[in-house]
Amino acid sequence: MSRMIFLALLVLLLLGACQSQVDLSQPPEIRYGEDVCTKCGMIISEARYAAAFYTVQGEARRFDDIGGLFIYHAENQEDVAQFWVHDYETEEWIKADQAFYVTSDQLHTPMGFGLIAFSEQDRAQRLASKSNTMVMSFDEILMSFVDGSAEHEHFDS
């Protein structure tokens, strides 16, 4: 009888462990107005600027500004399952390495990085032309944070 109880408890533990695992192929959930930014500790309130990732161990990292994600990664070099950003206009999640980025001091983002993402290059190009800047790739943005050339200025609302 005690063996049967032991097996039942083992099965329950295994089922519980399986249910608590996260899907690393999906972005972490962000509860806007509640969750705080991993980098700066501010409440994440706007989807269009937010970004996130899971470490390969399944730990979620959430950011109120796309630039915060990049600078955090440059400083911490965690093993990342997948970086995620929001499309600035549609607010849909997109894989960060498939996004097109526009950066400009005319774009007032939560932490002042002035960095936004688009899922389509033509929409990114339209805004870049208006802002007298260029469209950049994930690798170009990542390198600008790694080498320290990315700028950061906090704007008060």
Placement of each model-derived feature along the sequence:
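C-terminal motif of bacterial Sec signal peptides marking the signal peptidase cleavage site
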Residues: L14-A17
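Bacterial signal peptide processing site
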Residues: Q19-Q21
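Mature extracytoplasmic domains of secretory-pathway proteins
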Residues: R62-I94, F100-Y101
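C-terminal partner/receptor-binding element of secreted or periplasmic proteins
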Residues: S119-S157
